[in-house]
């Protein structure tokens, strides 16, 4: 659409005609607005179909994050016999949490701060269904952005009505002004184009380039990039320089430009586990869902193009070799770190004339562990878990040891396989879960491993899953300081222009038990979050912490006088990658296998959803697809408008 056509289209849609200024204003403000819609793929007779099965069928859901929980809840309500399998000892995925001992007390911790936006329609519905009320949330007082080279910009709760929402953002900015924004005609067009989001066209035209290139080619006003687009797009957990321009447009459409809800979001007054995940787990069990925590799905059992069972890890569950490694690669002392073709990290060492091998996945969340020279054991940087040289947990959230693997010599090679009951110090009996339907709702890494070990016959599907990627690693550094930081007026800040810090959260200002601890001790609890660390900035932990501390001092100078009484540093990589070109290879909810479905924020869907809402939405989509197979009523799913207001 050319500029002239666009303005003709705009005037027509807005109701603007010659000599009709009043009607134009009414048309613009009244009719031409984003409105909540419904994503409905059911047929015309959907309401006439039964809601539940008369005879239960078995469904296995793999993954206990938001996608798996939402799918399990919907299937259980339809009278399916649901088993949910989660490798971690707790549910929640990226919302999971655990307790630590610090300063003589127990504190809950998690992966980092989460804001809950009003347009998370499906997520909020799921919370409400589990009895999670408004008392667990408080409204954020604003959306402040700290810049490295100028004053803080505070974006308050913006109006929900277009064009006042975007004009409000510009008006609230100290750096931007309406006239300079409107005068920058060449750079205004690509911004307006972001209001033209339309799934097919947007991904056809813009998925081949990154968002920064899109902005620079379009000559977007640099001040608008620095003040609005860059800090907000970083929250995708993908750097603007490697984020697909099409995905960025979907993101901004969902969160702001196409949302009927403005910038409003809520924060929780308790930790994620007690406020959200535990009530959801109780709701699942009340509906009859069997929840298996600490059990890993090893592979799917396939027969005649269907999944007949899900095989869980355990003694006797071997499914061929895990890895084959030349003996010469194993060092004389220390451990060899090896990544198998299926993406499984393996640790191998010499023990005299014999060999020992461990599964290198942390038993907390499956992140790769690394040998720690100072202790002789292993460290998981994701959640600061530690294991001794035998693989037994010694600190942090992991409770189970690293699984022992079998090692067999074959000439000059070592063949690494799943442990037999005689070689593993901890024996877990293998189990096969028969199923009529299966939903894979794991994260990217877990799904890749599962499908690789399943070895499905459809190479196209296997290739799609294998191509899934994770974003650059992110860092969460939470510190307990011995004094408050009085200049912190907000509980949460977005940050722009620093090497690492992308946001900073003051937990002691809004969440228990940190509020009480701060009152008793006179201190504060602060969390610095780096959303996506560029490859050139991935450095040893002490260097990153030192730099982030300097950034804290720059943002809040009074912190220079504070002493860190306790700290937790986590660095991990488990958020979905949204790189240029990824979209075309991304698998959808339905697969080439009649009873196998996928769910997660990484799953392709035409609906304008993102992050947590995408996880819950695709979980519900999977349940709807299964319902269609059984001629059951499908649930219409609320969404923001499918298209931008200028589409």
UniProtKB/Swiss-Prot annotation:
Its cofactor is FAD; [2Fe-2S] cluster. InterPro entries: Amino_oxidase, FAD/NAD-bd_sf, Rieske_2Fe-2S, Rieske_2Fe-2S_sf, Zeta_carotene_desat/Oxidored. Its EC number is 1.3.99.39. Transmembrane segments: none annotated. The keyword Metal-binding applies. GO terms for molecular function: 2 iron, 2 sulfur cluster binding; metal ion binding; oxidoreductase activity. Keywords: 2Fe-2S, FAD, Flavoprotein, Iron, Iron-sulfur, Metal-binding, Oxidoreductase. Residues 322-416 form the Rieske domain. It catalyses: a carotenoid beta-end derivative + 2 A = a carotenoid phi-end derivative + 2 AH2. Pfam families: Amino_oxidase, NAD_binding_8, Rieske. Disruption phenotype: Mutant lacks chlorobactene and all its derivatives, and accumulates only gamma-carotene and its derivatives. The growth rate of the mutant shows no significant deviation from the wild-type growth rate at any light intensity. Pathway: Carotenoid biosynthesis. Belongs to the carotenoid/retinoid oxidoreductase family. Involved in the biosynthesis of chlorobactene, a carotenoid with aromatic end group. Catalyzes the introduction of two additional double bonds into the ionone ring of gamma-carotene to produce chlorobactene. The reaction includes an intramolecular methyl transfer from position C1 to position C2 of the ring. This is Carotenoid phi-ring synthase. It comes from Chlorobaculum tepidum (strain ATCC 49652 / DSM 12025 / NBRC 103806 / TLS) (Chlorobium tepidum). The gene is crtU.
């Amino acid at each position: 659409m050319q500029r002239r056509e666009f303005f003709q289209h705009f005037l027509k849609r807005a109701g603007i005609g010659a000599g009709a200024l009043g009607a134009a204003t009414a048309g613009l403000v009244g009719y031409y607005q984003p409105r909540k819609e419904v994503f409905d793929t059911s047929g015309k007779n959907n309401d006439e179909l039964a809601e539940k099965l008369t005879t239960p069928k078995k469904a296995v859901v793999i993954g206990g994050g938001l996608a798996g929980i939402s799918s399990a809840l919907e299937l259980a309500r339809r009278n399916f016999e649901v088993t949910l399998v989660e490798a971690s000892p707790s549910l929640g995925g990226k919302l999971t949490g655990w307790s630590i001992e610090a300063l003589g007390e127990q504190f809950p911790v998690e992966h980092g701060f989460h804001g809950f936006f009003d347009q998370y329609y499906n997520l909020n519905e799921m919370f409400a269904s589990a009895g999670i009320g408004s008392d667990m949330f408080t409204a954020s007082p604003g959306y402040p952005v700290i810049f490295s080279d100028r004053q803080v910009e505070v974006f308050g709760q913006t109006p929900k009505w277009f064009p006042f929402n975007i004009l409000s953002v510009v008006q609230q900015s100290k750096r931007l002004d309406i006239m300079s924004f409107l005068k920058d005609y060449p750079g205004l067009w690509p911004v307006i184009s972001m209001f033209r989001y339309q799934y097919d066209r947007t991904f056809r035209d813009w998925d081949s380039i990154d968002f920064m290139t899109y902005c620079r080619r379009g000559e977007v006003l640099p001040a608008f990039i620095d003040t609005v687009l860059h800090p907000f797009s970083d929250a995708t957990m993908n750097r603007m320089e490697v984020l697909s321009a099409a995905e960025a447009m979907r993101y901004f459409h969902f969160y702001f430009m196409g949302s009927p809800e403005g910038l409003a979001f809520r924060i929780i007054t308790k930790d994620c586990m007690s406020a959200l995940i535990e009530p959801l787990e109780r709701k699942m069990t009340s509906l009859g869902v069997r929840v298996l925590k600490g059990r890993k799905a090893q592979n799917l059992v396939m027969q005649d193009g269907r999944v007949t069972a899900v095989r869980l890890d355990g003694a006797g569950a071997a499914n061929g070799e895990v890895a084959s490694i030349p003996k010469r690669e194993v060092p004389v002392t220390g451990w060899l770190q090896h990544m198998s073709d299926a993406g499984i990290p393996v640790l191998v060492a010499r023990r005299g004339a014999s060999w020992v091998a461990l599964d290198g996945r942390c038993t907390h969340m499956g992140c790769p562990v690394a040998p720690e020279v100072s202790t002789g054991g292993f460290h998981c940087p994701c959640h600061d878990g530690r294991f001794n040289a035998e693989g037994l947990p010694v600190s942090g959230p992991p409770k189970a040891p690293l699984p022992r693997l079998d090692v067999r010599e074959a000439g000059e090679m070592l063949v690494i396989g799943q442990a037999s009951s005689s070689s593993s110090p901890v024996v877990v009996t293998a189990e096969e879960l028969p199923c009529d339907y299966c939903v894979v709702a794991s994260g990217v890494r877990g799904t890749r491993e599962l499908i690789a070990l399943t070895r499905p016959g459809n190479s196209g599907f296997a290739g799609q899953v294998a191509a899934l990627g994770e974003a650059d690693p992110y860092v969460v550094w939470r510190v307990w300081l011995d004094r408050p930081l009085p200049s912190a007026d907000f509980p949460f800040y977005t940050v722009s222009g620093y090497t690492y810090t992308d946001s900073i959260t003051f937990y002691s200002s809004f969440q228990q038990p940190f509020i009480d601890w701060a009152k008793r001790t006179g201190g504060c609890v602060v969390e610095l979050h780096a959303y996506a660390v560029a490859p050139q900035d991935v450095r040893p932990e002490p260097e990153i912490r030192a730099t982030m501390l300097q950034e804290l001092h720059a943002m809040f100078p009074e912190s220079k006088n504070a002493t860190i009484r306790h700290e937790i540093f986590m660095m991990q990589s488990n958020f979905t990658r949204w790189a240029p070109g990824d979209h075309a290879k991304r698998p959808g909810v339905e697969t080439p296998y009649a009873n196998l479905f996928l769910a997660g924020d990484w799953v392709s869907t035409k609906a304008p959803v993102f992050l947590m809402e995408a996880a819950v939405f695709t979980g519900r989509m999977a349940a709807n697809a299964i319902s269609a197979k059984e001629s059951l009523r499908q649930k219409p799913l609320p969404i923001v408008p499918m298209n931008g207001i200028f589409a």
